[in-house]
Curated annotation (Swiss-Prot):
NAD(+) binds at residues 35-39, 84-85, 115, 138, 175, 292, 316. It catalyses: NAD(+) + (deoxyribonucleotide)n-3'-hydroxyl + 5'-phospho-(deoxyribonucleotide)m = (deoxyribonucleotide)n+m + AMP + beta-nicotinamide D-nucleotide. GO terms for cellular component: cytosol. This is DNA ligase. The gene is ligA. HAMAP family: DNA_ligase_A. GO terms for molecular function: DNA ligase (NAD+) activity; metal ion binding. Residues 750-833 form the BRCT domain. It comes from Xanthomonas axonopodis pv. citri (strain 306). CDD domains: BRCT_DNA_ligase_like, LIGANc. InterPro entries: BRCT_dom, BRCT_dom_sf, DisA/LigA_HHH, DNA_ligase, DNA_ligase_AS, DNAligase_adenylation, DNAligase_N, NA-bd_OB-fold. The keyword Cytoplasm does not apply.
Length: 833
């Protein structure tokens, strides 16, 4: 009989998988987990956390809505979070939802507002005094993207409210979508013009709102339905959800004609049946229906769980499915070496999209389904969006198929593929010697939220890595314009002959002869077009061509000069960005920000024993160990040294947070070391009795027992300390703990920032630094950087092309700073741009 998995380990595994799925779905726009699997994992995690409240954690996916906003637009902090909804997949779950509300409110047959669940992009529209002032995407629920300019192009969205009686501030929540007929007409037009067609209406809507050029958005046939409200200030709304929707309609917002008020579970299920039967004939895509308690007083009584309201639920439709054939199973290697199996499929049309690939998640999933090359499989776009292999049609399996096995070697670098004990994920052990991991590491390092190297695209990163010019991320800072020009000529040429013809135009004769000799050196017959190896580009790059001074009068150089300038600009960064850019496993933006806020100094962080990281809120054992493992690797420390040697500068270094004083103690250290049987109570008891790690090291269990520690705990601690690695860790951790305490100010000496408690708004374009960088530096000085101007705004920083925010600030008498004043202020307070 197999023992049940340890709840703590299972909870940790579930949190990792769900957070990874959140990141891929919300940030990368590369979903690799089916909605059905995601929902199943989330429900299992919720059940385990209810059963084991002692294992609850603030960084659990159950405590949040999603992940981070995408990075191309300014951030907007939602005044009221845009929460997600719980899901129901069966009649029984809907009935249970109604029962809970009935019992809590003591209402036998509560009324609900029922409405279709549109498959588009959720947004929040902010109106002040009846005028549209800002629009934002949902993002992670707390912070979204400012897409106001794009939303202004959507004709269904009123720029000024009709009628009268609206609140001074009104946030309207709704869905931007693309009607089916408009989607088909748009694609027909694009085909006729040879333009790019859209994959499906949902992607069309989401992609349109993320266009940096609002003129492109204006050409897309977008529409909008309102379904609720967010912040409401200085005004009143009706006390029923259905009445609020009617009021919104009167003020000029489109509201779906399919919204109905129904009673009890029978009414909800009947509505679900009707909408399901009408689904294919609707003018827009939906993936379910939404039920909301109609009475607002009842909504307030029911309240919320951390990530969803208790008074609303989404009843999802079954996913759409088709059968096809598995033509191959391949391995993709990610940034951290994760080896993810992917099914290559015979193309099949599923829910409006041609599917050729589907994730198989991991080796355990393949074994569970017994997926084999040649199998007929059921492909599902769960949630009508994400392709997955749902099942194998076993009776159609051809003879002679073989059960799939995880390769023992990385398909890219040949290193061993290994699986850590207790982990579902297999990983390439090659680390940064693996080109695939190196390329992913570079992509992450230069990304917008990391070092923000503008203009370095994925394809050119591949060329850089394949050429051998960049072996580590620090090598980016050694590149020259001439090297970039040479790489571009090689990578874009159709043949070595074409490359040489182009090169002859831009090189002196002596340099050209040297280049030609290098090409001949890889075995290319230049007498004709025959015998050209297919790998000539990679061979030529690996051969290490000499670098030439190219005639820049005859060759386009602006792109290369801009890229070198972007690399130079990225040298000046923040600790938060630098840590995130390193690509440490499990360390996302929020963790990097917390590390920066609590420790403040890279030199401190990179030499900190891993147990001390657990003193930072929301950093648990897994993340702390991951940090420790990363900084324990000599290669990683060498990479950091190279970056610093190449003039990468962290501009916001500061002393550790005074809040650490309340966290740093021997009792907490003994707990954080994760010694078997040493509970928090026992850790406090041992710390009180012995006072230091040194006092515990060589005495064995007897002194512990004499101090009242139970025999089993004493033996466990003594045995743990006998392991040399554990002993070294404990000693180093206490030494560093003492050093940290000595660095902290005494009580009452804590320094405050010059902008503590002040709200600042940034608008327009800044020349010397990005708005993100300005925001981070202002926050480092204590400011809260908001997305909209109010009477509480301390000052507004106005860059070039400042718009309505500047007008509003002037009308309210808010102090206005230009960029020069901002830069001077930052410089005076140690925040050089």
């Amino acid at each position: 009989m197999t023992a049940s998995p340890d709840p703590a380990q299972r909870i940790d595994a579930l949190r990792r998988r769900i957070e990874d799925a959140n990141y891929r779905y919300h940030v990368l726009d590369e979903p690799q987990m089916a909605d059905a699997d995601y929902d199943k994992l989330m429900r299992e995690l919720e059940a385990l956390e209810r059963a084991h409240p002692e294992l609850a954690s603030a960084d659990s996916p159950t405590q949040r809505v999603g992940h981070l906003a995408a990075s191309r637009f300014a951030e907007v902090r939602h005044a009221m979070p845009m929460l997600s909804l719980g899901n129901a997949f069966s009649d029984e779950e809907v009935t249970e939802f109604v029962r809970r509300i009935s019992e809590r409110l003591e209402v036998r047959q509560p009324l609900f507002s029922a409405e279709p669940k549109l498959d588009g992009l959720a947004i929040s529209l902010r109106y002040e005094n009846g005028e549209f002032v800002q629009g934002a995407t949902r993002g992670d629920g707390a912070t979204g993207e400012d897409v106001s300019a794009n939303l202004r192009t959507v004709k269904a969205i009123p720029l000024r409210l009709r009628g009268e009686g609206w609140p001074r501030v009104l946030e309207v929540r709704g869905e931007v979508y693309m009607p089916r007929a408009a989607f088909e007409a748009y694609n027909a037009q694009m085909r006729a013009q040879g333009g790019k067609i859209l994959a499906n209406p949902r992607n069309g809507a989401a992609g349109s709102l993320r266009q940096l050029d609002a003129r492109i958005t204006a050409q897309r046939p977008l529409s909008f339905f309102a379904y609720g409200v967010g912040e409401v200030s200085e005004g009143a709304l009706p006390q029923a959800h259905s009445a609020i929707l009617a009021q919104l309609r009167a003020w000029g917002f489109p509201v779906s004609a399919l919204v109905e008020v129904v009673q009890g579970s029978d009414g909800l299920l009947a509505y679900y049946q009707r909408i399901g039967e009408a689904r294919d004939g609707l003018a827009f895509d939906i993936d379910g229906v939404v039920y909301k308690l109609d009475d607002l007083a009842g909504q307030r009584e029911m309240g919320f769980v951390s990530r969803a309201p208790r008074w609303a639920i989404a009843h999802k439709f079954p996913a759409q499915e088709q059968s096809t054939t598995v033509e191959a199973i391949e391995i993709q290697i990610g940034r951290t070496g994760a080896a993810t199996p992917v099914a290559r499929l015979k193309p099949v049309h599923v829910a409006g999209v041609i599917v050729t690939n589907a994730t198989l998640h991991n080796a355990d999933q393949i074994a569970r389904l017994d997926v084999r090359v040649g199998d007929t499989v059921i492909v599902r776009r769960a949630g009508d969006v994400i392709p997955e292999v749902a099942a194998v049609v076993a009776d159609q399996r051809p003879p002679g198929t073989q059960a799939w096995q995880m390769p023992t070697q990385c398909p890219v670098c040949g290193s061993e593929i290994v699986r850590e004990e207790g982990q579902a994920v297999w990983r390439c052990s090659g680390e940064l010697t693996c080109p695939a991991q190196r390329k992913e590491a570079f992509r992450h390092f230069v990304s917008r939220r990391a070092m923000d190297v503008d203009g370095l695209g994925e394809k050119f990163i591949e060329v850089l890595v394949d050429s051998g010019l960049v072996k580590g991320v620090a090598d980016l800072y050694l590149l020259s314009v001439d090297q970039l020009l040479q790489l571009r000529l090689i990578s874009t040429a159709d043949s070595p002959h074409a490359f040489l013809r182009e090169a002859r135009e831009h090189l002196a004769s002596g340099a050209y002869a040297q280049l030609e000799a290098s090409v001949v050196g890889i075995g290319v017959d230049l007498a004709g077009e025959r015998d050209v190896p297919q790998t000539w580009q990679a061979d030529l790059l690996r051969a290490g061509l000499p670098s030439f001074d190219w005639n820049r009068k005859k060759i386009a150089t602006k792109w290369a000069e801009n890229l070198i300038e972007a690399i130079e600009i990225s040298r000046d960064t923040t600790l938060e960005r630098f840590l995130f850019a390193l690509g440490i496993e499990h360390v996302g933006e929020s963790t990097a920000k917390a590390l920066s806020a609590w420790f403040g100094d890279l030199e401190l962080i990179r030499h900190l024993p891993w147990p001390l990281f657990k003193r930072v809120p929301d950093i648990g054992g897994e993340v702390a160990r991951s940090l420790g493992h990363f900084f324990d690797q000599a290669g990683n420390q060498k990479a950091i040294d190279h970056l610093l040697a190449r003039k990468v500068r962290i501009g916001d270094t500061h002393p550790p947070s005074p809040k650490l004083r309340g966290e740093l103690s021997l009792a907490n250290l003994l707990e954080d070391l994760e010694i078997p049987k040493v509970t928090p109570i026992r850790a406090a008891q041992i710390a009180t009795a012995f006072g230091s790690i040194d006092a515990l090291r060589n005495g064995g269990p007897e002194p512990l027992v004499e101090a009242g520690v139970p025999q089993s705990v004493a033996e466990s601690l003594a045995a743990w300390l006998l392991v040399p690695a554990n002993d070294t860790l404990a000693v180093n951790a206490q030494r560093k703990l003492s050093e940290l305490l000595a660095m902290l100010p005494e009580a009452g000496e804590e320094k405050t920032g010059p902008l503590d408690g002040q709200t600042v708004v940034i608008t327009g374009t800044l020349a010397a630094l990005t708005r993100d960088a300005a925001k981070q530096r202002l926050e480092a000085l204590g400011a809260k950087v908001a997305g909209s101007v109010s009477k509480k705004t301390a000052f507004l920083v106005a860059g070039e092309e400042a718009g309505s925010k500047l007008d509003k600030a002037q009308s309210l008498g808010v102090e206005i700073w230009d960029e020069a004043r901002l830069l001077a202020f930052l410089g005076d307070h140690g925040q050089q741009p």
